[in-house]
Amino acid sequence: MKEDAGNPLHLTSLNHVSVLCRSVDESMNFYQKVLGFIPIRRPESLNFEGAWLFGHGIGIHLLCAPEPEKLPKKTAINPKDNHISFQCESMGVVEKKLEEMGIDYVRALVEEGGIQVDQLFFHDPDGFMIEICNCDSLPVVPLVGEMARSCSRVKLHQMVQPQPQTQIHQVVYP
């Protein structure tokens, strides 16, 4: 196997994110009805309560916390906290649906070089943060080397011409 300095582990994609939860059923309901994931078969050899879901090219593995009462309580929505982010087709549609479902969210905005990225942040039932954005409009510019076209089209082995380096100058959080 030829060594690749830019990808030493020869990774190909993100497979799944595991999330500890108080109630597997409640979390499954959220990930299905709010984010559109579907339940998939989970190996029977896993001898603990959990569920696997799949959607948008990745898996979500829900793991029932052994001591649910010790999981951190939901806190204020903080866009700078750990989270997973999903690209969407229409921020307006997402915001309307969140309001219809009674889900509290925080809106944020990133502006860079005339490009505006809208972000919505909210929690799952256990306080794990979810971001929905239109981040695909923001180019992915490595600090060294070549530039990828955008978030959804990144292929490390097929990057395009080098671009001038820029940094995000302003991040506006409510």
Curated annotation (Swiss-Prot):
Induction: Accumulates in response to abiotic stresses such as cold, heat, drought, oxidative stress, genotoxic compounds, wounding, osmotic stress and UV-B. Slightly induced by salt (NaCl) and nickel ions Ni(2+). Strongly induced by methylglyoxal (MG). Keywords: Cell membrane, Cytoplasm, Lyase, Membrane, Plant defense, Stress response. It is found in: Cell membrane; Cytoplasm. The keyword Cytoplasm applies. GO terms for biological process: cellular detoxification of methylglyoxal; defense response; regulation of abscisic acid-activated signaling pathway; regulation of jasmonic acid mediated signaling pathway; regulation of salicylic acid mediated signaling pathway; response to cold; response to heat; response to jasmonic acid. Mostly expressed in roots, and, to a lower extent, in leaves, flowers, seeds and siliques. Residues 13-135 form the VOC domain. InterPro entries: Glyas_Bleomycin-R_OHBP_Dase (IPR029068), Glyas_Fos-R_dOase_dom (IPR004360), VOC (IPR037523). Disruption phenotype: General stress phenotype, characterized by compromised methylglyoxal (MG) scavenging, accumulation of reactive oxygen species (ROS), stomatal closure, and reduced fitness associated with reduced leaf area and dry weight, as well as prolonged flowering time. Increased susceptibility to the pathogenic fungus Plectospherella cucumerina which triggers mainly the jasmonate (JA)-mediated defense signaling pathway. Abnormal cross-talk between salicylic acid (SA) and jasmonic acid (JA) signaling pathways. GO terms for cellular component: cytoplasm; plasma membrane. PROSITE patterns: VOC. PANTHER family: GLYOXYLASE I 4 (PTHR46142:SF11), PTHR46142. Belongs to the glyoxalase I family. Involved in the detoxification and scavenging of methylglyoxal (MG), a cytotoxic aldehyde produced in response to primary metabolism alteration observed during biotic and abiotic stresses. Modulates cross-talk between salicylic acid (SA) and jasmonic acid (JA) signaling pathways during defense responses to pathogens such as Botrytis cinerea. This is Glyoxylase I 4. The gene is GLYI4.
